[in-house]
Curated annotation (Swiss-Prot):
EC id: 3.6.4.12
Residue sites binding ATP per the record: D428, E429, M430, G431, L432, G433, K434, T435
Keyword Disulfide bond in record: no
Primary gene name: CHR12
Location of the region described as Disordered in the Swiss-Prot/TrEMBL record: 55-76, 1002-1102
Record protein name field: Probable ATP-dependent DNA helicase CHR12
Class of this enzyme: hydrolase
Record's keyword annotation contains Translocase: no
UniProt organism field: Arabidopsis thaliana
């Protein structure tokens, strides 16, 4: 019955099941470990395991199991029998296990058998296997054979290490009596008195032995030390002798090497100087010979690559010359595939870039003379001017005078371009008569080539009257029309041209080229002449794109007096306009000159390599450009001298200058004590240098004769200078960037009874010619001509004046140069003196220094053929930060005396003494009063205090967020519109200014919702502005301007465009446009537009 219950409790399995048996034993063990009696069924199960048979069955399940009773006295206790039976059961169930030592032995035997088997396998391996596998097998075989030796070595090493670690100091351990263990103690052995004597004797003996050992050890140490020092000294002496001998041999060797290198350097220096002299003198034959002798790898590589380039360009130009133009229009569609090799990367082999005929040319050249590095240049030059025509006399149609010899040469060069079906650039220096040479070309083609035109002349608006006057003077028989004026006037001109159909020349300006494209593009122009061609240096401009893609033109000619800048991109832009199908990728154009050094880590160039690259670049453009300078062709033209006159600033100017540098605001006469916050701090500092009236409102009374002079250092200098120049018989051209300043100058000239004329961007086109005629009359009563640099510095003939005053210099020195050449040109009979007014220690000195750097060769950075004369926005920002840090500390320092200024201004000794006498008379008349306004005379409202927020910021004005341009009325050159939008607007006759402003505002409103980062900068600007800003006043004026009639609006936009004409001098700075309620944005602009913004703003106020 117990078996049945056990079977039921254990899942109904049989007793012989080992799993159930094990479970029963584990269950019994749990009871016994807790000192509990086994249940009957479990006891039966364990007993059956021990005896091998089940016990007697019990009764049915309804019979309860017997209760445990106490065992009889004559039997063993219940627990003893149970434990014995349990142990026997465990023994029966326990497997026959091996002992630990036996298992280790078995494991060792197994490892040995494996090793032996592996040894036999390795020994039986054939030797025909690979070398790597054979080497690995041999290493493994030797390692297994040396296993026992390795074990012995490890045992010996570990034993030795243990001994050295534990028995390092044997002598000290010998005398360490604590380590001695005697077999028996001394106590109780022998007589106590004898033991005491023995102890004393033993101590004495031990002490003697110890002292002897110490002495011996000390002697040994001393001997070893002396021996060591002796060896060291001997080694030092030997080492010193060796060093001396080595140094002597090294000196002898170095002296010889240095002498050899010195001779080589002298030889290389002489060769380099000879090469540079040959290169500067443009003696190519001698330079190539010297390069071959020097065996300079870099120079040879550069020459070979550029020689191949020139050969390829010559072949391409020849194909263009041979191309037949459909209907006389310059569309080289058939030659697109022939020119595709010029667009291929330079990394490909040259033979892959050339057509078959070019490969034959190159191979034949290499076979004839592989070292002729000038062959490519000869092919290039011969391909361009292959058809020559000698011009010895001027056309008979020219009636206004006789051409000079160099002008005849220019005419011959332009005729050569015409005969060779090419375009070019006439880049004579300003004042050499580019206009007359161009008119002579038109007359020559009309008279000798039978080319009546039509000719399209595109020029700045300021020089249109000059073109018309020159045509009327020199070739009155040629029908030249001026296409300008309001919409009704232009419409009448179009009807007249369309009705008669007889005209030779049409003269217009840049704006109408884009605005009236719908009409002008219908005419097939034979020649297009672009005056001031540097406007096309940016090939991405709307003007360049319009002229290239919108007009049908057979020939092109550029006129520019500005020298070609050392910029590959600008150079390529001009070539792209002249030959758009040859120079059609600026990237490939740069790669042509970068390729020789593309695979080298060192791309820095020497002076010779820089000069060589410049010469090779000029060789590319030289056949298309003709440039002569005044000192080369006009030997008898009077000289031009530039004098920098430095002046101090008045106390009012210094107050405003300090306020701008410290707080970015100036005090105004508002009655409320508020000040005016400013933007574009560089422009504000320049206004401080000119006159404090530029900050005051229109209600301020400027008609104060003493104050208008004493408030400005420059006006004070003018007040001393002008009477002297008028008495000496000189006439003056005064140029300024700011039209508001010209307004103040007009007040000063009126107060002092000086007769003057004025020309700026607001002057009408028909009035400009009249103003020039009035000033250039023989007995003209006008003493001074006031001109804005942008509008009056281009194409005006004012050689009747012999003095030029640059009131405030331009960032771009070319603008000042052009302004100076209005007087220094053909027809000038007097020495021209140019006075540049500069406030001492101010931002104007920085501007002047930057202009000098740009004019010099040191401002050019050349790396692997790349030319860069621009400074980055970071450079401009650092310059402004330096000015702000310097503040007013250097204002008024090193101001020249009156005598020094007289010495600089006088052109003769008599003039100097006359100026001295006039100064003395003036000083006596003024009773030696101070010429400039002092601190106590500055109006109280001119001072401003810091706001609470500025005080919290320790008065440090954060100028970094407001160094941008002022908001000016947007002049549209259609760059803000897409090509499709612009074409639609032009053909439909819409106002491009209004359309562009509408699209611009839409973009700004969209960007305003997306850009959240600009809010912090806007808030910073708001904290600096307490009163009405100058930009808000300008916006109100713009709104009033929009209400003008259509006639006035068209005229104003045209004149403001003329005022804003300028070339990009590449000086980019950070600009923040005016923050207004509806939009805010920031952008990047060109630094030269500082003056453009000011000039344009002044014209609007005017």
């Amino acid at each position: 019955m117990v078996a049945q219950q056990l079977q039921e409790r254990c899942g109904g399995t049989s007793q012989e099941d080992p799993v159930e048996t094990t479970k029963s034993l584990i269950c019994a063990l749990n009871y016994i470990s807790r000192d509990l009696p086994l249940p009957p069924h479990l006891f039966t199960a364990v007993s059956s395991i021990y005896h091998g048979a089940s016990s007697s069955s019990l009764s049915d399940s309804d019979v309860s199991p017997p209760l445990p009773t106490s065992p009889p006295a004559n039997k063993a206790p219940y627990g003893a029998d149970l434990m014995g039976e349990f142990e026997d059961a465990l023994l029966k169930q326990r497997p026959d296990c091996e002992s630990g030592s036996r298992l280790i032995q078995l494991l060792d035997n197994r490892n040995k058998s494996h090793i032996q088997r592996r040894l036999s396998e390795l020994e039986e391996l054939p030797s025909t296997r690979g070398e790597d596998l054979q080497a690995k097998c041999l290493l493994e075989l030797y390692g297994l054979k040396l296993r026992e030796l390795q074990g012995k070595v490890r045992t010996a090493v570990s034993s030795e290490f243990w001994l050295r670690l534990n028995c390092a100091d044997v002598s000290s351990q010998v005398f360490d009596w604590g380590m001695m263990r005697l077999p028996r103690p001394f106590y109780g052995v022998g007589d106590p008195f004898a033991m005491e004597a023995d102890d004393q004797f033993r101590k004495k003996r031990d002490a003697e032995r110890l002292s002897r050992l110490e002495e011996e050890e000390k002697n040994l140490i001393e001997t070893a030390k002396r021996k060591f020092f002796a060896e060291v000294l001997n080694a030092v002496r030997e080492f010193q002798l060796q060093i001396q001998a080595t140094q002597k041999r090294r000196r002898q060797r170095n002296d010889g090497v240095q002498a050899w290198h010195g001779r080589q350097r002298q030889r290389a220096t002489r060769a380099e100087k000879l090469r540079l002299m040959a290169l500067k003198s443009d003696d190519q034959e001698a330079y190539m010979k010297l390069v071959k002798e020097s065996k300079n790898e870099r120079l040879t590589t550069l020459l070979e690559e550029t020689n191949k380039l020139l050969a390829n360009l010559g072949a391409a130009v020849q194909r263009q010359k041979d191309a037949k133009l459909p209907e006389g229009i310059d569309l080289l569609k058939d030659s697109e595939s022939d020119l595709s090799e010029l667009d291929a990367p330079r990394s490909e082999p040259l033979q892959d870039l050339l057509p078959d005929q070019d490969i034959d040319i190159t191979e034949s050249d290499n076979n004839d003379d592989s070292n002729d590095l000038l062959e490519g240049q000869r092919q290039y030059n011969s391909a361009i001017h292959s058809i020559q025509e000698k011009v010895t006399e001027q056309p008979s149609l020219l009636e206004g005078g006789e051409l000079r010899s160099y002008q005849l040469e220019g005419l011959q060069w332009m005729v050569s371009l015409f005969n060779n079906n090419l375009n070019g650039i006439l880049a004579d220096e300003m004042g050499l008569g580019k206009t007359i040479q161009t008119i002579s070309l038109i007359a020559y083609l009309l008279e000798n080539k039978g080319v009546p035109g039509p000719y399209l002349i595109v020029a700045p608006k300021a020089v249109l009257p000059n073109w018309v006057n020159e045509f009327a003077t020199w070739v009155p028989s040629i029908a030249a029309f001026l296409y300008d004026g309001r919409l009704e006037e232009r419409k009448a001109i179009r009807e007249k041209i369309a009705g008669e159909g007889k005209f030779n020349v049409l003269i217009t300006h840049y704006d109408l080229i884009m605005r009236d494209k719908a009409f002008l593009k219908k005419i097939e122009w034979y020649y297009m002449i672009v005056d001031e061609g540097h406007r096309l240096k940016n090939h991405e401009s709307a003007l360049a794109k319009t002229l290239l893609t919108g007009y049908r033109i057979k020939r092109r000619l550029l006129l520019t007096g500005t020298p070609i800048q050392n910029s590959l991109q600008e150079l390529w832009s001009l070539l792209n306009f002249l030959l758009p199908h040859i120079f059609n990728s600026v990237q490939n154009f740069e790669e042509w000159f970068n390729a020789p050094f593309a695979d080298r880590g060192n791309v820095s160039l020497t002076d010779e390599e820089e000069l060589l690259i410049i010469h090779r670049l000029h060789h590319v453009i030289r056949p298309f450009i003709l440039r002569r300078k005044k000192d080369e062709v006009e030997k008898f033209l009077p000289g031009k001298t530039q004098v920098i006159l430095k002046c101090d600033m008045s106390a009012w100017q210094k107050v405003y200058y300090k306020q701008v540098t410290d707080m970015g605001r100036v005090g105004l006469q508002t009655g409320s004590g508020k000040s005016k916050s400013l933007q574009n701090l560089t422009m504000q500092l320049r206004k401080c240098c000119n006159h404090p009236y530029l900050f005051v409102g229109g209600d301020y009374n400027m008609w104060k004769k003493p104050e208008i002079v004493r408030a400005s250092g420059k006006f004070e200098l003018l007040d001393r200078l002008l009477p002297k120049l008028r008495k000496a018989g000189h006439r003056i051209l005064l140029f300024s960037q700011m039209t508001r300043l010209i307004d103040v100058l007009e007040i000063y000239l009126t107060l002092n009874d000086y007769k003057y004329l004025r020309l700026d961007g607001t002057t009408k086109t028909d009035q400009r010619g009249l103003l020039l005629k009035q000033f250039n009359e023989p007995d003209s009563p006008y003493f001074m001509f006031l001109l804005s640099t942008r509008a009056g510095g281009l194409g005006l003939n004012l050689q009747t004046a012999d003095t030029v005053i640059i009131f405030d210099s331009d960032w771009n020195p070319q603008m000042d140069q052009q302004a100076e050449d209005r007087a220094h040109r053909i027809g000038q009979k007097k020495e021209v003196r140019v006075f540049v007014l500069v406030s001492v220690g101010s931002v104007e000195e920085v501007i002047l220094e930057r202009a000098k750097q740009k004019m010099g060769i040191d401002a050019k950075v050349i790396q692997a053929g790349l030319f860069n004369t621009t400074s980055t926005a970071q450079d401009r920002r650092e310059m402004l930060e330096e000015i702000m840090r310097k503040g007013t500390s250097s204002l008024g320092t090193d101001v020249p005396s009156e005598r020094e200024i007289n010495r600089l201004a006088a052109r003769s000794e008599d003039e100097f003494w006359m100026f001295e006498r006039m100064d003395e008379e003036r000083r006596r008349k003024e009773n030696y009063r101070a010429r400039l306004m002092q601190e106590q005379e500055v109006p109280e409202w001119a001072y401003t205090t810091q706001t609470q927020e500025e005080k919290l910021n320790n008065g440090k004005f954060h100028f970094g967020s407001v160094t941008g341009k002022r908001k000016r009325k947007e002049i549209v050159y259609s760059d803000t519109l897409s090509e499709l939008q612009w074409l639609k607007a032009v053909e439909s006759g819409e106002d491009l200014s209004k359309l562009s402003m509408r699209y611009n505002r839409r973009e700004e409103n969209a960007s305003n919702t997306k850009t959240s980062t600009s809010k912090k900068v806007i808030e910073s600007i708001q904290t600096v502005s307490d009163g009405t800003s100058e930009e808000d006043e300008e916006e109100q004026e713009e709104e009033r301007a929009k209400e003008m009639s259509g006639k006035q609006r068209v005229d104003k936009s045209e004149e403001e465009e003329e005022e804003g004409e300028e070339e990009n001098d590449g000086k980019a700075i950070f600009k923040w446009n005016t923050h207004k309620k509806k939009r805010s944005r920031y952008s990047f602009t060109c630094s030269s537009s500082d003056s453009r913004a000011q000039s344009s703003n002044g014209s609007r106020r005017k």
